[in-house]
């Protein structure tokens, strides 16, 4: 939601953006939308939104080859914010990465499909345990 700063006080706009984040729009409950609305309208919102906008401007792909640690990429197959092709590209560029897809899932698999996301992360952490 990096582009929401000018309209952050527009509740309907925040609700719409929140719904677009998920494959299953029912995940964007009123409680979640209320929480996000409060967050983007807090004093720290400008810093958060500024950080989000900086990620849009910075192309991380050119730096990924520098990462030498194991990486776990978990991607919603129905992500409309950052398309699945980006996950494939990141996976190719990260030498020690594994890529996991979650079907019927949008941009935030940890919120939309925690029952699938958490075991993937647990398994990855067990593998890299030193």
Regions found by a protein language model. Name each.
Residues 62, 85, 112-115:
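Generic recognition of short, well-ordered alpha-helical segments
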């Amino acid at each position: 939601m990096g582009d929401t700063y000018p309209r952050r006080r527009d509740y309907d706009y925040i609700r719409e953006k929140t719904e677009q984040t998920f494959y299953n729009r029912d995940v964007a409950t009123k409680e979640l939308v209320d929480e996000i609305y409060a967050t983007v309208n807090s004093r720290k919102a400008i810093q958060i939104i500024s950080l989000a906008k900086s990620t849009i401007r910075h192309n991380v792909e050119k730096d990924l080859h520098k990462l030498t640690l194991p990486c776990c990429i978990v991607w919603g197959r129905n992500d409309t914010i950052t398309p699945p092709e980006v996950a494939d590209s990141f996976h190719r560029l990260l030498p020690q990465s594994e890529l996991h897809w979650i079907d019927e899932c949008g941009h935030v698999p940890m919120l939309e499909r925690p029952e699938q996301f958490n075991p993937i992360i647990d398994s990855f952490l067990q593998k890299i345990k030193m």
